Amino acid sequence: MALRVTADVWLARPWQCLHRTRALGTTATLAPKTLKPFEAIPQYSRNKWLKMIQILREQGQENLHLEMHQAFQELGPIFRHSAGGAQIVSVMLPEDAEKLHQVESILPRRMHLEPWVAHRELRGLRRGVFLLNGAEWRFNRLKLNPNVLSPKAVQNFVPMVDEVARDFLEALKKKVRQNARGSLTMDVQQSLFNYTIEASNFALFGERLGLLGHDLNPGSLKFIHALHSMFKSTTQLLFLPRSLTRWTSTQVWKEHFDAWDVISEYANRCIWKVHQELRLGSSQTYSGIVAALITQGALPLDAIKANSMKLTAGSVDTTAIPLVMTLFELARNPDVQQALRQETLAAEASIAANPQKAMSDLPLLRAALKETLRLYPVGGFLERILNSDLVLQNYHVPAGTLVLLYLYSMGRNPAVFPRPERYMPQRWLERKRSFQHLAFGFGVRQCLGRRLAEVEMLLLLHHMLKTFQVETLRQEDVQMAYRFVLMPSSSPVLTFRPIS
């Protein structure tokens, strides 16, 4: 999950580091004579004080993606604005994403997520890769990649995710059988939220939580509540200076820290159990990502815990929401749904024998997920702090500048995606689209949990399509709201009807 920050003057402390980073960069090769200066970049301005009041009333950030989309329409594909005395540049074209990637060093820098960092500092906890930059980030990331992102890692945890996906469908079939009409109409978002927690926890810690049934244990309920509370409070704290929120939002800070404490304690318990079981007798079978990391001993235990916390917290909404929106789009595009069903039925034998085949034998379904993330990018935007000077849209952008790449606006740009309002998975199979599918980021700082998320979505949808017809009466678009992640302002109601 990429770092989400606002595009305005609301965060004081994090922006201050931009002044210090400028001196760390190097100058790029001389650009053409027509190169325009940084000051010539169109400038975006707004009433920062009015926005601050709106945020304090908890109504100022939900339309961030729409406000920035409107700014691109008015100002063009690049604009800048001031935040905390520093300059931020916003872009939205694939060509600019490619340029950002081309100049990326082995130590790409991102902004820190202030509320999360504040918790780690106050509790004296180590930071995971999401909150790190520099050599420490690189050391941790190189140790984590083989156990989380590599093909071998995927091969190891795919059967665990497949087990959870099959159990989810069995639970859904049971609910349908209990309905006299032979179908089930429901808001599926919470069920998918539970599925992603269950699957991620099993892949990480090798333990099932029992979240797919009716009777959830108190510990699981407490953990789920903490995740919801953490994301909600993050949004409330993210857009305002801590010097202000310490007085105006003391209860929110308490809720935020309490939520992270629960998540931290949960990760501690899980890791302690894995550690003890390994010391008592190493299993000959794969039992999860954390067990593999502990066995290898390449990272200290507190670093494993720090990264497990992030993988646990970051693998829920970012997977559940694309599943919700994919099911909704398939429900209102039955022809697309039928094409996907034909593909999944044709691949059923190979996937049943080897669940990892879902990654290679379902190209149209993979394209459908790309199409969903084009229209509904969970992160909204990506960001980088430039290590060197760069030319974007023929403007000189100096080293140390924070550049935001808006995925929502890219995905709805007709110059990039013809007929962007249409849900057309086939477009991803017609030709190669470089730097247009960036929902998981790019380069060496792409999302660490990318493969786990892809597997969870592919297998769940594969089993869903061969079992149920998904329907909806709703044809109008679902409005999205920025709540740290981009999510439906109200979840669509879907009907699940068994396939004869």
UniProtKB/Swiss-Prot annotation:
GO MF annotation, one: steroid 11-beta-monooxygenase activity
Endpoints of the signal sequence: none
Protein name per the record: Cytochrome P450 11B3, mitochondrial
Transit peptide start-stop: 1-24
Record's subcellular location: Mitochondrion membrane
UniProt EC number: 1.14.15.4
SUPFAM superfamilies in the cross-refs: Cytochrome P450
Catalytic reactions of this protein: a steroid + 2 reduced [adrenodoxin] + O2 + 2 H(+) = an 11beta-hydroxysteroid + 2 oxidized [adrenodoxin] + H2O; 21-hydroxyprogesterone + 2 reduced [adrenodoxin] + O2 + 2 H(+) = corticosterone + 2 oxidized [adrenodoxin] + H2O; 21-hydroxyprogesterone + 2 reduced [adrenodoxin] + O2 + 2 H(+) = 18-hydroxy-11-deoxycorticosterone + 2 oxidized [adrenodoxin] + H2O; 21-hydroxyprogesterone + 2 reduced [adrenodoxin] + O2 + 2 H(+) = 19-hydroxy-11-deoxycorticosterone + 2 oxidized [adrenodoxin] + H2O
Swiss-Prot/TrEMBL GO biological process terms: adrenal gland development; aldosterone biosynthetic process; C21-steroid hormone biosynthetic process; cellular response to hormone stimulus; cellular response to peptide hormone stimulus; cellular response to potassium ion; cholesterol metabolic process; cortisol biosynthetic process
Protein purpose: A cytochrome P450 monooxygenase involved in the biosynthesis of adrenal corticoids. Catalyzes the hydroxylation of steroids at 11beta, 18- or 19-positions, with preferred regioselectivity at 11beta and 18. Converts 11-deoxycorticosterone into corticosterone, 18-hydroxy-11-deoxycorticosterone, and/or 19-hydroxy-11-deoxycorticosterone, but not to 18-hydroxycorticosterone or aldosterone. Mechanistically, uses molecular oxygen inserting one oxygen atom into a substrate for hydroxylation and reducing the second into a water molecule.
Keyword Mitochondrion among UniProt keywords: yes
Transmembrane segments: none
Family label: Belongs to the cytochrome P450 family.
Cross-referenced InterPro entries: CYP11_CYP27_families (IPR050479), Cyt_P450 (IPR001128), Cyt_P450_CS (IPR017972), Cyt_P450_mitochondrial (IPR002399), Cyt_P450_sf (IPR036396)
Entry keywords, A to Z: Heme, Iron, Membrane, Metal-binding, Mitochondrion, Monooxygenase, Oxidoreductase, Steroidogenesis, Transit peptide
Binding site residues for heme: 447
Top-level EC class as recorded in UniProt: oxidoreductase
Acetylation found in the keyword field: no
Gene it is expressed from: Cyp11b3
